[in-house]
Amino acid sequence: MGFLDFLKPRSKENVESCWPGGKMLQVHIEYNTQETVFTYFGRYGLQFSVPKSNLTNIIVKEVNRTHSVLQLYSGENCVGTSDLLPTEACNIMKNWVLQY
């Protein structure tokens, strides 16, 4: 992602999104229904994409009693890890991804 990419318009026609903590948490996950790709947008520019066909497992890994990370797996490999988020937000994103 380039420095000024945020200025480019992005088509949201075929995109569903989940903001687990609202806009204040600043993280969200999108699903492009046409390309069947999940894209995570985190804080400080963290971003990764995983095709739905490659996604084999979703794990909410607890870091402490209140916070966790969401990990997306393709086979044995972890292909994406979210920011450190409240466990409830991770569970919301996991359930949202599983509905597709």
Predicted feature residues:
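Acidic, Ser/Thr- and proline-rich intrinsically disordered linker/docking segments
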Residues: 2-17, 56-100
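N-terminal topogenic membrane-targeting module
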Residues: 10-24, 33-34
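Phosphoinositide-binding peripheral membrane targeting modules
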Residues: 24-65, 76
